[in-house]
């Protein structure tokens, strides 16, 4: 994969996998961190990570990172990295609902030559 000047990355899900990834990409590339949890986005915009995956200094170093709950903010992205939770149920089977919902959402936004990574 060749990274071009117009690369814009969307990280879908800002948990223990997605947030550190978004922070690192946001130091170099235009990056949008998307999550459905409004309070999660609010705390990150204020420079705080309640999961303690990323410290305040790292959050501040990601100058090209935008946090959002709005799908219109990720429409212009051309790389989508889906990092939503896959919890298990009582029978220890994966609950794929978050993954399916994220995939459907991204599927509605895809354009020719876009890349989706799971």
Q: What do the PLM-derived regions correspond to, one by one?
A:
Residues 1-118:
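Structural/interface elements that position substrates and couple domains in central-metabolism enzymes
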């Amino acid at each position: 994969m060749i990274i071009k000047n117009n690369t814009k990355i969307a990280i879908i899900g800002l948990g223990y996998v997605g947030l550190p990834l978004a922070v690192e990409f946001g130091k170099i590339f235009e990056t949008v961190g998307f999550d459905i949890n409004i309070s999660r986005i609010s705390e990150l915009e204020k420079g705080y990570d309640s999961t303690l995956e990323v410290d305040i200094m790292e959050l501040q170093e990601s100058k090209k990172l935008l946090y959002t709950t709005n799908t219109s903010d990720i429409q212009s992205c051309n790389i989508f990295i889906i990092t939503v939770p896959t919890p298990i149920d009582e029978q220890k089977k994966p609950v794929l609902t978050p993954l399916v919902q994220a995939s459907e959402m991204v599927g509605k936004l895809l354009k020719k030559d876009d890349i989706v990574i799971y």
